[in-house]
Amino acid sequence: MTPNKPTLHPRNRHQGRYDFPSLIKAHPDLARFTITNPHGKPSIDFANPEAVRVFNRALLKAQYGIQHWDIPADYLCPPIPGRADYIHVAADLLADDNAGDVPRGTQVRALDVGVGANCIYPLLGHSDYRWRFLGSDIDPVALASAKAIVQANGLGKAITLRQQANRAHILSGLLQEGERFDLTLCNPPFHASRDEATRGSQRKWKNLGKQDPKRKLPVLNFGGQNNELWCEGGEIRFVTQLIGESVQYAERVLWFTSLVSKASNLPGIEAALKKSGAKAVRIIEMGQGQKQSRMVAWSFHDDAARQAWHAQRKSQA
């Protein structure tokens, strides 16, 4: 028997088909990008970067109350349902140590490693759970874009941003004295080289073009800056470095997490986690449509210590 593929999380707001009339009402500019797909349903051309950007703007406004959202040209335009799923799966992880209740409110702090120009995880996490976020990045242009989004939506008290000054580090040197986080999030660079990233982008274009054999494939990549799409050594090197650096913050973070796109990277990641001395490890499968991924989570606190962490936070609320 073939196992069922993971579907969207039950709390994900993006179940079923998109409600285009509601989206267009929230953001009328979407109307000029709306087309009828081969099944006779309203859609957009997902190979058109501007259409995807306007579509995201409409989704964020209609579903999350985010009034202002934009990103610079050639920066990654995230698929929002998949990003939301990561937030919900991470919320369930916190709930497991909290008598099954998802902790909500500004007492919960999350760190988004690689917040990007789109600032998507802090926006979704704060909207759904009222968590406070710190977003880090090595790219000053991305941080400036994220800051503009935060300020335009009056979220300065909920979302703060910080540059990782040393491009060779991920966590090291980033956190300030005494900072504690319930959760870290990370969507690491997927590819190991620019050429690999370009080939991956071309595959995406070809997949999108299957419905329209007349589509001309562009020469440039699918969207995303170099540091968003690839790093030396790829996903496996980035995540294993993140694990190594997490050890120095073992007492100050309840759960570290990262997405892992390539299942073939899991054995190396699990070996790094064993070496790190993590006391709890979770690998949770996720999936949206044809895309399969998983969240890897690790903690240096045992069961009793994690429950005590939540109890302490509640007592300080």
Curated annotation (Swiss-Prot):
Leader peptide range in chain numbering: none
GO cellular component, one term: cytoplasm
EC top class named in words: transferase
GO BP: rRNA base methylation
Pfam family of the protein (one): Methyltransf_10
Protein localization: Cytoplasm
Alphabetic keyword roster: Cytoplasm, Methyltransferase, rRNA processing, S-adenosyl-L-methionine, Transferase
EC number assigned by the record: 2.1.1.181
InterPro entries: METTL16/RlmF, rRNA_lsu_MeTfrase_F, SAM-dependent_MTases_sf
Principal subcellular localisation of the protein: cytoplasm
CDD domains (UniProt xref): AdoMet_MTases
GO MF annotations in UniProt: 23S rRNA (adenine(1618)-N(6))-methyltransferase activity
Catalytic activity line of the entry: adenosine(1618) in 23S rRNA + S-adenosyl-L-methionine = N(6)-methyladenosine(1618) in 23S rRNA + S-adenosyl-L-homocysteine + H(+)
Disulfide bonds: none
Family: Belongs to the methyltransferase superfamily. METTL16/RlmF family.
PANTHER family: RNA N6-ADENOSINE-METHYLTRANSFERASE METTL16, SAM-DEPENDENT METHYLTRANSFERASE
Function: Specifically methylates the adenine in position 1618 of 23S rRNA.
Annotated protein name in UniProt: Ribosomal RNA large subunit methyltransferase F
